[in-house]
């Protein structure tokens, strides 16, 4: 990566602004998954060990109006972070103003402060999400000219708390998490050890058109599963029953199949049910066709075997999107089968592109078997598409 990283700058005695991704799920004010906080620890610890004063920025959920602020405070995150670091985290509970400035100016070397949810600034004219130049300038003024971006999850967005601050500091650098994310995903796509197999699931073809197009050029094989299978089926005239389909994407699916030259591998059977919820019958289809009155909710056993074979000997695998409705035990065999087929390959570099696939690996107990699990669904998708991420582009060149 030809950008400066946190190791390239002198941090001692400096007020260091850090964009982290603490957008964690909360239930009744309790954090239900703290992965993103844990992922940010190496960068935060490095800054304070070097004698820097870490000033952290993050968003949490969406905040459009005053009423949305309830339940979207970063207070529970500050408490969780303090426990993980084993030291106090200063939390003024505001995003700007005299109270925040005083708290920052009172920091000593090695201390940590967390600014309140940056999206609180969206209540008045979406200042954070629309990268209001004055807000970026103000937040940049709170530090000593160094900004560390460690929030891969928002790197595909141009917000005041990443691109806005970057534009107003002397040095904008990458944190360890951002550096690793880029290294794993970009390297996998641009300079993979071959054979390179990509696996794409999820419900919509429309979400993945750019990714499929880019990966058809880069990968040796592209395996398709999940709900988008049925748009590809219908494009070929295969019966899909009541399965999910994007009628307006049939031509796109047809064009992708023609362009693929056999690289695109589709499931050969499905697990079908007579309803999405409250079904009374679940069975495997004979072949590709889904029965009338039924809908496909997972890939079937023949497809799992076919994908297992397609993955044999793979050295690089990028996976984005589950094979079926994995949250339901009746329809998780496809996702489990594909995960197991990936991780059993000797010496494979296996990467999960965030989002639902990451949740599937964690919930189904396979997370520790993968080389890398991305913290950013949307950002990793854009990297897989070959796009330039604004949050990354805004960093200082080496």
Swiss-Prot record:
Enzymatic reactions: (2R)-3-phosphoglycerate + ATP = (2R)-3-phospho-glyceroyl phosphate + ADP
Keywords of the record: ATP-binding, Cytoplasm, Glycolysis, Kinase, Nucleotide-binding, Transferase
Binding site for substrate: 21-23, 36, 59-62, 119, 157
A Pfam family: PGK
EC number: 2.7.2.3
Primary enzyme class: transferase
SUPFAM superfamilies, alphabetized: Phosphoglycerate kinase
Pathway linked to the protein: Carbohydrate degradation; glycolysis; pyruvate from D-glyceraldehyde 3-phosphate: step 2/5
InterPro entries in the cross-refs: Phosphoglycerate_kinase, Phosphoglycerate_kinase_CS, Phosphoglycerate_kinase_N, Phosphoglycerate_kinase_sf
Transmembrane spans: none
Gene Ontology cellular component terms for the protein in this record: cytosol
PANTHER family given in the database record: PHOSPHOGLYCERATE KINASE, PHOSPHOGLYCERATE KINASE 1, CHLOROPLASTIC-RELATED
Name used for this protein in its record: Phosphoglycerate kinase
